[in-house]
Amino acid sequence: MKVIKTLSIINFFIFVTFNIKNESKYSNTFINNAYNMSIRRSMEESNPPTGASGRAGAGASGRAGAGASGRAGAGAGAVASAGSGDGAVASAGNGANPGADAKRSTSTPATTTTTTTTNDAEASTSTSSENPNHNNAKTNPKGKEVQEPNKANTETQNNSNVQQDSQTKSNVPPTQDADTKSPTAQPEQAENSAPTAEQTESPELQSAPENKGTGQHGHMHGSRNNHPQNTSDSQKECTDGNKENCGAATSLLNNSSNIASINKFVVLISATLVLSFAIFI
């Protein structure tokens, strides 16, 4: 009888210690799973605000830089074109080819004596537009052969004054037209340069939204991959399942194992109590 009593008591203490170890194990796994879930949620909640701030900063800086650089470039281009237009107007006769103008002035001063009193630029433009001798000046830059038709013109001027008047009328209006047409055509070129500068701004501004989409994708994957990977079965199930249900299956398994251990504990306690009463009675 004493042997049965001692065996029952030893069995009772062994079962109690075994159940305590199991309970501590399951409780530790449950606590670890809950802790890992809380860490994941905190990481996922903390990462999107930082990503949004980074995106906003990048977009603002990109847009500001693109707008400033594009507009500054457009303004500089417009100023440069305007300056070039003014230079072209000022040096219509002498700026392009000073040597050619000097040769033209020696070879073809003008068709009549009246046009010599006008400016050199007007004389050069008038002869370049309609004077047949000017074509000879282009083909012969030295101006040797051009002087001969000029002598013929001076002889015809001395013979008849009517021809001189007709030549002055035929030569003077083209100078005015050339002078008036050249400044008007150049502002049109300056105006045409402005839309091209505006068109160069548009692709830079349109490229900003694309850099946003790639930034969002990178931030999301970076936040997911930077988490510490755990090798337990319960955490693998969390990665495979939804975020909301993460840990639900593991908690149910832990609860079922705890229930089974409790049932075993109750059965063994009842058995030991029955044996103890039987022994003592």
Curated annotation (Swiss-Prot):
Residues 256-281 form a propeptide. Residues 150-174, 181-209 have a biased composition (Polar residues). Residues 54-76 have a biased composition (Gly residues). Disulfide bonds join C238-C246. It is found in: Cell membrane. Residues 42-242 are annotated as: Disordered. The keyword RNA-binding does not apply. It is a lipid-anchor; GPI-anchor. A lipid is attached at N255 (GPI-anchor amidated asparagine). The keyword DNA-binding does not apply. Residues 44-207 are annotated as: Polymorphic region. Residues 51-74 are annotated as: 3 X 8 AA tandem repeats of G-A-S-G-R-A-G-A. InterPro entries: MSA2. Sequence repeats lie at residues 51-58, 59-66, 67-74. GO terms for biological process: cell adhesion. GO terms for cellular component: plasma membrane; side of membrane. Residues 1-20 form the signal peptide. Glycans are attached at N22, N36, N158, N230, N254, N255. Residues 77-133 have a biased composition (Low complexity). Keywords: Cell membrane, Disulfide bond, Glycoprotein, GPI-anchor, Lipoprotein, Malaria, Membrane, Merozoite, Repeat, Signal. May play a role in the merozoite attachment to the erythrocyte. The N-terminal region appears to be involved in lipid binding. This is Merozoite surface protein 2.
